[in-house]
Each structure stands twice: as structure tokens, then as C-alpha cells.
A protein has these predicted regions:
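Phosphate/pyrophosphate-binding catalytic cores of soluble transferases and nucleic-acid-acting enzymes
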Residues: 1-319
Length: 319
């Protein structure tokens, strides 16, 4: 059975994925699916570094501006949306290109991971949420570390949703969600995929992150968060727990100064980038690329297309 073709372009935040993805899509006749857990939200543009319409250069994008910030977004919903998008792209006669830095989301697509949604338990989850709200993020993160240290390494201590989900899974199944996900990763992929990861030197990456945050502030990040807050959104909304939004909310609530908020955004983004790199290094069948080893994006895309063509010779399905 012939597998569907899929190109993945991943990498840490600020590694240059957006511009490379556009050039690659134009070269190979691709359409882009965003694998970003924040860019799905309408009205959250500055803080997510969302691609602008003119920057798309006519390349169709999926999973951008598809939900209101009041709506929850999870990995199961993401999987369903991606499958639908891939089918539509195939009907259009194009190649799907999955682009983003959320490694767990990308992995869920590549290996069609089953998250056992039928084992959700509302009572247990509610109790864990109440415990989280009462005891705080650090307490619950330490609790997770004692239960499942592997999951704790890959989940930020402030990621309430994933911490609760990992603990809930253990309480229901008496098994570790990290082991379940690892077993799912060993499945054969339903896709004939090529997996590229942009991996610039850390010092350059961190400089780019700092510059990006400064640009966000200049482009109106504070105003964007203020508008969202005035619309009734708060830290209780999943959409407002993203980096950039939660820190500015703290500033608007008078908990920290603006300079402190900006510094926190930079620091938290650098930490996120480090976790993203660690995640991708655990993946298999990955082609790592230092984008700064190439004269320009055209040369970089030449290299990517060459790699795709080389694989084609070994796998006639990718034609």
C-alpha cells in the first residue's frame, strides 16, 4: 500500500522555519500545515510571531486562525485537523509540509499516536485541577517528577494541562504516559515522510530570540494582550498560558514591571528552545540542518530538495 507523502520542517523557535517553508513549498508544490499550538488562535498574532498574509506569497496555510482564544486546543484535536488538512492538500494535488516547533505535536502526526482518550476520568481530572490550583505549579511538577521523570523532563513546570494529563494517566492506568508514548513512536509511520530540523548554533539562536521578543514589543504585544484581557480572557484560558501572553498579563495585573515581563519572555523562550532542541535530538530519521552554513535560503532549499530526491531513488513511493 502506497503511503501518503509528508514533509516535516521543524526546529526551535526563531530558527527561521517560516521563510524556509515558503521557499520549499514554492519549489516542490507544497501547502503548509502549522504545527504550532498557539497560531491556531485568532487575534493572537504578535505574540505568536504569526505569518502575515503577504509573507505567505500565495502558499496556502492550514491550522492558522481557526479557533477563538476562548476555545481549548489539545493534541487530539490537532491530530484530527492535520489529517483533514492532509487529505485536502492531496485533493489539491500538492504535497503537505508540516511546519512548527512543537515536537510532541509533530510526533503525534508522524506516528499517528493513540492517546487513549477513552480513559479520561472527569472526577480524577477535576481533583487534580483543584490540587494544582491549591498547591501550585511547583508542587504538582515535583509530584510528576516522582511519578514519571521522563515526562517531567519534557514538560514545562507551568504547563498545567500536560502535567495533569500525565498524572491522570498514571492514576487511571497504573502505567507511565511516557512509556505509552514511546511505544507509539515505535510504530511504523502511516506516511512516507522526510523530517528536516533547522538547528542553528545556540548563541545565534538565543540572539535571534531576544531580537524577536524586542520586535514583538515594538509591534504591539502589550496592546494585543490588553485587548484580549478586555475581551474577558485571563490566565485561566489555555490560549493565555502561552509564552509572551502570561508574562504580559502579569505586567497588566501589576505583579511585575514591563521590563521584568520582557526579560521573563526572553528567558522562558530560550528555555523553551532548549527543550525543543532536546526533543528533536531524540527523534529518529531526522535530517539536521544548520541554516547558517548556507549562503541563503535558496541554497538551503536546494540541499533539502536534493535530500528528498536522494530518498526518492531508494523509495519509489515518493514520486
Amino acid at each position: 500500500m502506497t503511503k501518503d507523502k509528508l514533509i516535516i520542517l521543524a526546529g526551535p523557535t526563531a530558527s527561521g522555519k517560516t521563510s524556509v517553508s515558503i521557499d520549499l513549498a514554492k519549489r516542490i508544490g507544497g501547502e503548509i500545515i502549522s504545527a504550532d499550538s498557539m497560531q491556531v488562535y485568532r487575534g493572537m498574532d504578535v505574540g505568536t510571531a504569526k505569518i502575515k498574509a503577504d509573507e505567505m506569497q500565495g502558499v496556502k496555510h492550514y491550522l492558522i486562525n481557526v479557533l477563538d482564544p476562548t476555545e481549548d486546543f489539545n493534541i487530539v484535536k490537532f491530530q484530527d485537523m492535520v489529517k483533514y488538512s492532509i487529505e485536502e492538500i492531496r485533493r489539491n494535488g500538492h504535497i503537505p509540509i508540516l511546519v512548527g516547533g512543537t515536537g510532541f505535536y509533530i510526533q503525534s502526526v508522524i506516528y499517528d499516536i493513540d492517546f487513549d482518550t477513552q480513559d479520561d476520568n472527569g472526577d480524577i481530572r477535576k481533583a487534580l485541577e483543584e490540587e494544582y490550583d491549591k498547591m501550585g505549579a511547583n508542587f504538582m511538577y515535583e509530584k510528576l517528577k516522582k511519578i514519571d521523570s521522563v515526562s517531567a523532563e519534557n514538560i514545562h513546570k507551568n504547563n498545567k494541562k500536560r502535567i495533569i494529563r500525565a498524572i491522570e494517566y498514571f492514576l487511571i492506568n497504573n502505567a507511565l504516559i511516557s512509556e505509552h508514548n514511546e511505544s507509539q513512536r515505535k510504530k511504523d509511520s502511516p506516511y512516507d515522510f522526510r523530517f528536516f530540523v533547522l538547528n542553528p548554533p545556540r548563541d545565534i539562536l538565543y540572539d535571534r530570540i531576544n531580537q524577536r521578543v524586542d520586535k514583538m514589543v515594538d509591534e504591539g504585544l502589550v496592546r494585543e494582550v490588553k485587548d484580549l484581557k478586555n475581551a474577558g480572557l485571563s490566565s485561566a484560558n489555555i490560549s493565555m498560558q502561552g509564552i509572551g501572553y502570561k508574562e504580559i498579563l502579569e505586567y497588566l495585573d501589576g505583579e511585575i514591571t514591563l521590563d521584568e515581563a520582557i526579560d521573563n519572555i526572553k528567558q522562558n523562550t530560550r528555555h523553551m528552545a532548549k527543550r525543543q532542541v532536546t526533543w528533536f535530538k531524540r527523534e529518529k530519521d531526522v535530517i539536521y540542518i544548520n541554516p547558517f552554513e548556507f549562503e541563503n535560503n535558496e541554497k538551503l532549499v536546494d540541499y533539502m530538495v536534493e535530500k528528498i530526491d536522494m530518498e526518492r531513488k531508494d523509495n519509489e513511493q515518493f514520486e
